[in-house]
Regions:
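Conserved AMP-binding/adenylate-forming core of the ANL superfamily
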Residues: 46, 50-104, 121-126, 130
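Short acidic active-site motifs
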Residues: 7, 14-16, 123-124
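Structural motif
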Residues: 90, 136-138
């Protein structure tokens, strides 16, 4: 089975095993969420993709199949609420696993993710919303 990266990267090595050439072969329709995460969800569904540990020590493990399924659910929820390709979505979440699900979901839709820390002040949020011409806030 060809490694996923081999579809998108051509590497050449010399006799000493040193990389001598690297070429990126990224098609115009490349989508990390579909082409990598979902492909891993099909090839290695039970392999761990994310291990998240909360501030209270709570542990949550996501396999690639989980990440594929949950990002599909989130993408469908965003679409049902009007988010479409090209929309700018600012995401303000504490360090939480939901950030990664939302990231993959927006990637699948073709929306533009604008990450922002939850530690900003009101004036900072207002500035970002206006400067980025934000369509949606999470």
């Amino acid at each position: 089975m060809v490694g996923i990266h081999e579809k998108y990267v051509t590497e050449k090595y010399n006799a000493d095993g040193e990389l001598t050439e690297l070429k990126i072969n990224c098609p115009d329709n490349y989508n990390f969420a579909y082409d990598v995460i979902d492909e891993l969800g099909r090839r290695s569904p039970d392999k761990k993709a994310i291990i998240w540990i909360g501030e209270d020590g709570t542990e949550k493990i996501f396999t690639y199949a989980d990440l594929m399924r949950e990002s599909n659910r989130a993408a469908n929820m965003f679409i049902a609420n009007g988010v479409k390709k090209g929309d700018k979505v600012i995401c303000i979440l504490k360090r939480h696993y939901q950030f990664w699900i939302i990231t993959m979901a927006l990637c699948k839709i073709g929306a533009v993710l604008i990450p922002a820390t939850n530690q900003l002040k009101k004036k900072d949020y207002i500035y970002r919303f206006k400067a980025a011409d934000v369509d949606y806030i999470v």
